[in-house]
Amino acid sequence: MVSFKSLLLAASAFTAVLGRPFDSFDGPDVNITDADELLVRRQVTANSEGTHNGYFYSWWSDGGGQVTYTMGAGSRYSVTWKDTGNFVGGKGWNPGTGRTINYGGSFSPQGNGYLAVYGWTRNPLIEYYVVESYGTYNPGSGGQLKGTVTTDGGTYNVYVSTRTNQPSIDGTRTFQQYWSVRTSKRVGGAVTMQNHFNAWAQFGMNLGAHYYQIVATEGNGDFVGTEIWGLARGCRR
């Protein structure tokens, strides 16, 4: 849940992610108009979390603009938005672990948005991101650069930042954010979470008791977003 820098964006700017869900990467594409694929559709309504088709989901929005979160079969989800405040949502697991997450798809943002493995811990209260791709703003750049970690065929810059009196899983709190931001953006491949956790610990960035961990889309901006799909393949739970 990050406040982005203000950007002037063309009215035609858009974001798109297309792909297949975590658990059926090699299966046929699903027609998103099928009624059985569109279980939950929200347009800036109540924030929520729970379980859907065997996966944990979380959805949070600050209530601004127009944003719709749709959950489909298995791990499939989509987000569309226009003129929004901040939102973050996706599907994954509860609790988070050092699992290896394999994913694929396409992601071509032209504004404030990114695709990441996203989660929380308690005691200490930590919000964390492993950012695989992002649009016009590097979401970790407002924090303190701690170093780098090389894993899964790439290098990630590691940042830490502090959020003061901001929304969290435990209400309004002050907490730290941990970031690993891939230097060469990609959509597709493995994310070995344990390697990031180990690197963070070496930089004195300790985690607490894990809450959820999801493949998430986060966005903010005065532009139109088209359909977005988070996906993965062959996940080790």
From Swiss-Prot:
Glycans are attached at N31. GO terms for biological process: xylan catabolic process. It catalyses: Endohydrolysis of (1->4)-beta-D-xylosidic linkages in xylans. The keyword Signal applies. One of its GO terms (molecular function) is endo-1,4-beta-xylanase activity. The active site is at E127 (nucleophile), E218 (proton donor). Residues 1-19 form the signal peptide. Belongs to the glycosyl hydrolase 11 (cellulase G) family. This is Ethylene-inducing xylanase 2. It comes from Verticillium dahliae (strain VdLs.17 / ATCC MYA-4575 / FGSC 10137).
